[in-house]
A protein has these predicted regions:
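Structured loops at beta-to-helix junctions and adjacent beta-edge loops in soluble globular domains
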Residues: 40, 48-51, 104, 126-128, ...
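Short, conserved beta-strand element in jelly-roll/cupin
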Residues: 103-105, 116-132
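Catalytic core of Fe(II)/2-oxoglutarate
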Residues: 126-165
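Non-heme Fe(II)/2-oxoglutarate
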Residues: 1-93
Length: 165
């Protein structure tokens, strides 16, 4: 079991977790935040019911809740999908909420935003296209350097933007 307080650490730290072999051809991609026509797609690792339709788990929860008169929160999306197997060791140890693979195509981006509050953090596993010639992640006025096939802890309290070339 993991027992440490990551909230005291820097904005981004590399974690020593096992390498995951992921067959990208087996993933089912759906438009991420479908109201925005940005070149980005997702595949659910967790969802409300274990299905991987992408609805509503790849949508903006604020917009989805408003349109459908629901009150979904990040932690409601905790049922593993068939794509969760490579991360079972982590899902068994952490209280994970909405989790997904993200694929940004050329020109794909996330504008300046803040996802959650002081008490949440993001665990990232980078697969491919994360070098400085492919991806720029700016957070807390710093460009974060990512590498392929690495695990990272990332604080959620800062505003950030991400661009893929």
């Amino acid at each position: 079991m993991f027992s440490f307080d990551l909230s005291v650490y820097e904005d981004l730290i590399e974690l020593e977790l096992p390498h995951c072999d992921i067959d990208l051809t087996s993933l089912e991609w759906h438009r991420y935040n479908p109201r925005k026509f940005v070149n980005r797609f997702g595949c659910s690792i967790t969802s409300l019911d274990g299905n991987d339709s992408g609805t509503p788990d790849l949508d903006s929860l604020i917009e989805y809740n408003r349109e459908h008169n629901t009150e979904y929160q990040e932690l409601d999306f905790k049922t593993p999908t068939k794509h969760a197997a490579p991360f079972k060791f982590l899902l068994d140890e952490l209280t994970c909420g909405r989790s997904h693979f993200l694929k940004l195509g050329t020109g794909g981006f996330f504008p300046w935003h803040r996802d959650n509050d002081l008490f949440t953090f993001r665990v990232l596993y980078t697969i491919e296209g994360c070098g400085s010639n492919d991806l720029v992640w700016v957070q807390n006025d710093k460009v974060l350097e990512l590498q392929n096939h690495k695990w990272y802890y990332c604080k959620e309290i800062y505003v950030r933007r991400i661009h893929f070339f």
